[in-house]
């Protein structure tokens, strides 16, 4: 969807970033009855997700919960309750609910049965749209104005968005050509938000 130049939009919730984290945030908002608007600088959704699919799309790992959570090192205590709620079994159920069967490879990794990302992404987007999620592509987030409104550059001109809640799902600093350039670190620093330096995963 495109908005008129210098236009303003008011939303309940904005998700900035249309990768897997942003889509999952939009899904959670929609399931809670919140109207979600997803903004992304790219022309289409899930660019890195589709790139990952070229290697078969490793969704998760099927090992038991204890060794699985131990792989998160110092963060395992923090992440254990989250992985109990949405760990490997739930990821597989989520994919199956979207009509995508999965299998466990010889390494224990979990893949879509057809080893492709596109069918899963298409089904996910169809589900999100049916739940009322709206997508605003080619909208590059440029920061906040003096009143705290979000600012975007769009093909039709600059727009300002007021939102009651904002989820930043902007990715790391890799694959700048796919939208993950780490520019958001400077924007957060300007607003006094402390961040940790980006590190390879």
Question: What does each of the following model-derived ranges do?
Answer:
Residues 51, 118-119, 123-201:
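Predominantly flavin-linked oxidoreductase catalytic cores and closely associated redox partners
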Residues 5-21, 37:
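Beta1/beta-strand and adjacent pyrophosphate-binding region of the FAD-binding site
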Residues 14, 30-54:
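Glycine-rich FAD pyrophosphate-binding loop
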Residues 18-21, 25-30:
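Small-residue (primarily alanine) positions within well-ordered alpha-helices
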Residues 56-104:
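Glycine-rich active-site loop/strand segments that organize a redox cofactor
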Residues 32-34, 98, 131, 191:
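Conserved dinucleotide-binding and phosphotransfer motif residues
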Residues 13, 34-37, 102, 166, ...:
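Hydrophobic anchor at the start of a short beta-strand
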Residues 79-89, 106-126, 175-183:
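Short beta-strand to alpha-helix junction loop
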